[in-house]
C-alpha cells in the first residue's frame, strides 16, 4: 500500500513539476536555451542576467565585446565584420558607466582572448554618480544560478506569462528581441518623435529658439575614469568608442539649456581614451529623421547597420558622424555649433515646434 502511495505521489509531483517547468523552457524568459521558440518574440526583463545566460552558452567563440545602454542593443553583432562579437549592452539608468567594467571583466574571464572592444558613450553617463546595478554573481565572476533552479520558481511563471501574453506591457514595449536575440523595433507600438519636441517646448517655455536661455543640469567629467578603468581590462584589444545617435531635438535641448560646452568637453576627453571614436549625435540625415526612431533615443537596426560599417571601415563617416580623433576640440565644437545654429535648421525646427504644440 505504502509503495503504491509513494509511486502515485512521485508521479503527481513529476506531473506538477513538468506543468511548471515545460512552459518556462518553451518561452525561456531568462534565455538559458533558445528564447521564446513559440512565436520568436523575446521581451527584455533583466538583461543584466539574461545576456549573461546567453553569453555562457558558448563563451569561447567570442573575441569581441559590445557595451552600452539600451540604445546600443540595436548594434547587432553581425554588423561588425571580421569578429565574433557579443552585444552585452543593457537598459540603463543614469550612471550606467559604473557597470561597464564589471561586465568587461566577466567577459574576459569566460571568453577567448578579446581582440575588439566597442563602447557606446552616452550623455547621461556624465550626469550622475556611477551605478552598479549588476548581479552579484557578475561582481564575483561566478556562474549564474542553473536553469532548473530558476524555472521551478513562481517568479519564472510570472515572467513566462508576460512573454506568452501578447497584450502584456512587456510584449507591447517598443523594443524587443527577435529569435536571434537582436534588438528590433516592435511594430505593435511606435511612439511619436513629436512627443520629445513637445517636452522640450514645455521645458523652455515656447518655440522661439535663437540662443541658450537657461542653464540646465551640467555634465561632469567625474565618470570618465570608469571608461579608463574598463579599457585597462583590454590591453591587447583594439578599442572603438562612439556616441550613439540621438534625435537632433535632444541635442538641441542640450544646446538651449546652455550645457553643450560641458557635453562636448566630456565626449572629447573620453574619446582620447579609445583607438577610434565617432560621434553620431551631431545633426545629420539620421538624427533629423523621425521615422528612424521611436522616441528620439533609440534608432532602428538599419541605422545601426550603417554605424557598424563606419566603426570598422570608416565608410560614410563624413556625413553621418564626426571622427573626433582626427580633429582638435575647437574644430569639433565649431562643427557641431555650425549645424545647430544654421538658419535652415532653426527655421525648420521652429515651424515644427509650433505645429506640434498648437501655436
Where are these regions (language model features)?
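Active-site segments of SGNH/GDSL-like serine hydrolases
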Residues: 231-255
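Membrane-embedded segments
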Residues: 61, 66-152
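Short extracytoplasmic
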Residues: 42-66
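Well-ordered, non-membrane alpha-helical segments in soluble/globular domains
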Residues: 97-104, 217-227, 257-270
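Hydrophobic membrane-insertion alpha-helices, especially the h-region
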Residues: 7-25
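Alpha-helical transmembrane signal-anchor/signal-peptide segments
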Residues: 26-50
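C-terminal regions of proteins
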Residues: 251, 265-359
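Secreted/periplasmic serine-hydrolase-like ester/acetyl group-modifying domain
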Residues: 121, 130, 134-237, 326-359
